[in-house]
Regions:
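Conserved beta-strand in the GNAT
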Residues: 47-49, 55-66, 73-81
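Short amphipathic alpha-helix that is part of the acyltransferase structural core
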Residues: 1-34, 41-57, 145-146, 151-179
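Conserved acetyl-CoA-binding loop-helix of GNAT-fold acetyltransferases
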Residues: 82, 88-101, 113
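Short glycine/serine/proline-enriched coil/turn segments at secondary-structure junctions
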Residues: 68-70, 137-138, 154
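Conserved active-site alpha-helix within GNAT-family acetyltransferase domains
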Residues: 105-109, 115-140
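Recognition helices and adjacent regulatory flanks at domain boundaries
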Residues: 28-29, 39, 91-94
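Accessory recognition modules or surfaces
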Residues: 88-89, 93, 139-150
């Protein structure tokens, strides 16, 4: 279960294992280029891994962002991947909770995510209405844009999420038009 996993920041030596995890976790999506780029900006993208003994069990990234007109205080969660054989054992939940704690400790007050509402709502995420994603989402994905308020600010942000260049690919924010 989740208590058996050690969560820590990833190191450069972990990159190959992290990159090999994503095709197994998301066989229908190619997230490797994004993850590779995020691993190259450790001051902006906080990369966490869950270790099961000496084996990689999961990975999560939280990217520091801002809202147009404001400075910082916002992060984008994702991608999150768990070794398929270890899914539904609390690995992803443990990674995300640890990441949220770390974000709060660094002064982040809002964490946004584009993901399954049924999963993320269990972790305290709610549909986000004040901060818009950097690209328009398909109507059927509207409920997938969510956030969790961590405190650290008296007034909520409103506006468009400003993401680093690694996230500025419209294909990351909607279904593949070729599908």
């Amino acid at each position: 279960m989740a208590g058996e996993f050690n969560i820590r920041k990833s190191r450069q030596a972990d990159a190959a294992a992290i990159l090999s995890l994503y095709p197994r976790s998301f066989p229908d999506e190619d997230l490797v280029p994004l993850v590779r780029e995020l691993l190259m900006i450790p001051d902006t993208a906080i990369s966490l891994i869950a270790m099961n003994d000496s084996e990689l069990a999961g990975h999560a990234v939280l990217t520091l962002c801002s809202v147009a007109g404001n400075n910082g205080g916002v992060a984008l969660l994702g991608p999150v991947a768990v070794e398929p054989a270890l899914q539904r054992q609390g690995v992803g939940t443990t990674l995300i909770r640890d990441g949220l704690r770390r974000m709060k400790e660094t002064g982040v007050h809002l964490v946004c995510v584009l993901g399954d509402p049924a999963y993320y709502s269990r972790l305290g995420f709610v549909t986000e209405s004040l901060v818009e994603p950097p690209y328009p989402l398909p109507a059927e994905w509207a409920g997938a844009w969510q956030s969790q308020y961590l405190g650290n600010s008296l007034t909520p942000d409103a506006g468009t999420l400003v993401v680093p260049s690694q996230w500025r690919d419209p294909a990351l924010w909607g279904p593949d038009p070729a599908s």
